[in-house]
Amino acid sequence: MSWRPVTVIKYWYVGGHRDNFPQVVTSKYPIENVRRIVGQAPDSIVSHGAGWARIVKNGRPVNIVTLHTWPQAYAFQAVDRDASKAEHGGDRYRRMEIEYICSHTIATQSDAGQQLWMMMGDFNSRSRRDNRVYNYPDDDTRLLVHDYIAEHTPYVDVIAEKHPGEFHTTTHGQSRIDFVYCTQPLCERITRAEVIADDFTEPVRDPGKLSNFYHPSDHRPILVDFDMK
């Protein structure tokens, strides 16, 4: 029997959240809370919150942004959900959320493109880089979130960059809605990046057929390794 060394997790961080869906960062290095993000009422609420944490590795700050955008087809707090859905309210709400999150994190740094930044989570949105699979119209609102990131930030889509021309679903269906983004200086340190698809991570529908409930999860994990020397 062989044994592998175990990394002891000494530090943890919970981002801003308004409900029971926070994001958590664990680390063997001390974590600084830079900002917990929940948005502003009445029209800029970040539904599940977001966080901006920072660690220092070998003397270099690493900025970590976590998020989980609004999941529904209608807008958050929509009074008439059917009408909101017909107007693509959910897509437009997620577009507002990502602009709010980016403007309060990476956009606060004029030289962010030369710094070490990552942003990750369940975006509940599809990317134009995968549109050869989806075949959506060019102006489809389902592409708004990642269009904003591509047009207004220095972030690089890690999975798309490391697996050009390939499609890797992150759900039980054929949807890539979970992403890891990095700025180029951090992207250059990546040694491995993949969506983990195996017998354990395969989403299996709950026997009780609970709505949208899968074991072990309705999302597949994304693994990204970095050489931070």
Regions picked out by a protein language model, each given a short descriptive name:
Residues 56, 63, 90-123:
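His/acidic metal-ligating clusters that form di-metal
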Residues 2-4, 23, 98, 102-107, ...:
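Short amphipathic alpha-helical segments and helix-helix/interface helices
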Residues 65, 74-79, 129-132:
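A short secondary-structure junction signal
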Residues 2-7, 43, 81-83, 134-139, ...:
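Glycine-rich, phosphate-binding/catalytic loops in enzymes
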Residues 74-92:
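A solvent-exposed, charged loop/short amphipathic helix patch at secondary-structure junctions
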Residues 1-72:
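Structured beta-strand-rich core segments of catalytic domains in phosphoester-bond hydrolases
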